């Protein structure tokens, strides 16, 4: 990936904040493996740089959603353990073995198909984590009998390693009894068979709110990057997480709308008086969505309104007269109390902070900050 970029919109990623959040989880669960979830390009931050920095700060295990994501990490020198949380097509099983990637077993049928697709040329081990469906209703085995049968099948093959068992909480970030019920169901099922090396069930919310002594690994995702899974979790815990992302654009042009003149598609904004506007080279193709019309951005310390429709590549802001081309504009801030925090943006978009981060597209350069050091990743100029 290139260390150059040629546009006036980019993300700032604070790697020290990510490392600090990782340490929070290591401290909360000192006897557990912190399985850092870096799927979805590390929730938009950039999986390679994030994983590399986390390894330098003690991470030994990563989780991703797809084999492609795992191979990307391997291609960039990430040697730690990697678990694919999603379902790999059975025909691609040799690729997982080749790249030393652990896989999720979602069903007995999948395991049988996977075994059929292991070529005779493969002599390396295949690590497997069995997924139990304790209430999420998505992937996983729902009954103890099938779980035991899957373990028995794995044990018949010297090449296969029953490395882990896990489940996923549906409502850990909300009040109620469901998470406790899921945890109990998980323990009951796991206790009916031999135990593997890794037993894990806690996502970010579960890791922040629950002890789960039965388990020896946790899977924090969103909170590694400094964000609470919900307002409920933020209010319940005393743990301080450091937000790690800023979205910045520099003004490329200013101009004056006269009274009666409109701007952007649909002419949804018409000036009633002479109005100075600033054009920002960022739009919904970058993840700054059309619904952000009417929201506010930070221009030189001033809260300035986004006017007119947000375009694919441009956003228009009503600004003070003294604003000029080149001035920096904060669209997403890394301060929790900021009017541009990820949570405020998520509320404006009628969504959750996860989606705001994951929407930040690959065409945005990522500028990584590690103390005084600065690194640039531009995925478009590989």
UniProtKB/Swiss-Prot annotation:
Transmembrane segments: none annotated. SUPFAM superfamilies: Alanine racemase C-terminal domain-like, PLP-binding barrel. Pfam families: Ala_racemase_C (PF00842), Ala_racemase_N (PF01168). Its cofactor is pyridoxal 5'-phosphate. It catalyses: L-alanine = D-alanine. Pathway: Amino-acid biosynthesis; D-alanine biosynthesis; D-alanine from L-alanine: step 1/1. The keyword Membrane does not apply. Keywords: Isomerase, Pyridoxal phosphate. CDD domains: PLPDE_III_AR (cd00430). It comes from the Bacteria. The keyword Isomerase applies. GO terms for cellular component: cytosol. The active site is at residues 39, 265. Substrate binds at residues 138, 312. The modification N6-(pyridoxal phosphate)lysine is found at residue 39. GO terms for biological process: D-alanine biosynthetic process; peptidoglycan biosynthetic process. It is an enzyme of class 5 (isomerase). Belongs to the alanine racemase family. NCBIfam families: alr. Homodimer. Catalyzes the interconversion of L-alanine and D-alanine. May also act on other amino acids. This is Alanine racemase 1.
